[in-house]
Swiss-Prot record:
Classification of source organism: Bacteria, Pseudomonadati, Thermodesulfobacteriota, Desulfobulbia, Desulfobulbales
GO cellular component, one term: cytosolic small ribosomal subunit
Coiled-coil intervals: none
NCBIfam families, per database record: rpsC_bact
Domain of life the protein comes from: Bacteria
GO biological process, one term: translation
Protein name in UniProt: Small ribosomal subunit protein uS3
Length: 217
């Protein structure tokens, strides 16, 4: 089961929380579509800023958006000029008051989404897929992750028949629910078609207070 399902969804409320935090009754579908619009817009708008994830909270008519990015300086801009423009664009998109909170990703080499996006960009520039995968694996292991797995699928190297190639180093225990596994999917648009890039990063086990006491004894 752990091999098939999304590693993030199966670990909700165990090692990670929801990306959208709000409650709605009759407006549920409206808010859900708004969240999708916000994420799609930000992914396109901040494609050069190393955007890792977007967390959305709602209170009344206000929307609070947390952006986790590897390059906060690009998002904020000189004297906060860029973030003000971005805020106005988002308010126009959703017709609500928007508050932005920028958080820096201090170890982008150990962030699954940033690793996947980086490999996808390299494949679009015609870098050999094996070289891109091995470089990402060695960089992640240098930053202290306990295991990493990368899979690329599509017409790799311009081959006539599509296939899937993967590389793994260390442990990536997908069946262990207390394992903190970060997962991401990215797409590389090449002249031969779309190449899918999947990344799993194992950062260690998250133990409860009861388990920590048992380990200490």
């Amino acid at each position: 089961m752990g091999q098939k399902v999304n590693p993030l969804g199966i670990r909700l409320n165990i090692t990670r929380t929801w990306d959208s935090v709000w409650y709605a009754d009759k407006d549920y579908s409206t808010f859900l579509i708004e969240d999708q619009k916000i994420r799609k817009f930000l992914k396109k708008r901040l494609s050069h800023a190393g955007l890792s994830s977007v967390k959305i909270e709602r209170t009344g008519e206000q929307v609070r958006i947390k952006l986790f990015t590897a390059r906060p300086g690009i998002v904020i801009g000189k004297k906060g000029a860029e973030i003000e423009i971005l805020k106005r664009e988002l308010e126009k998109l959703v017709s609500r008051k928007v508050t932005l909170d920028i958080q820096e990703v201090r170890r982008p080499e150990a962030d699954a989404q940033l690793v996947a996006d980086n490999i996808a960009q390299q494949l679009a520039r015609r870098v050999a897929f094996r070289r891109a995968m091995k470089k990402a694996v060695s960089s992640a292991l240098r930053f202290g992750v306990q295991g990493i797995k990368i899979a690329c699928s599509g017409r790799l190297g311009g081959a006539e028949m599509s296939r899937c190639e993967w590389v793994r180093e260390g442990r990536v225990p997908l069946h262990t629910l207390r394992a903190d596994v970060d997962y991401a999917l990215s797409e590389s648009h090449t002249t031969y078609g779309i190449i899918g890039v999947k990344v799993w990063i194992f950062k260690g086990e998250v133990l409860s207070d009861k388990d920590k006491g048992a380990v200490a004894q």
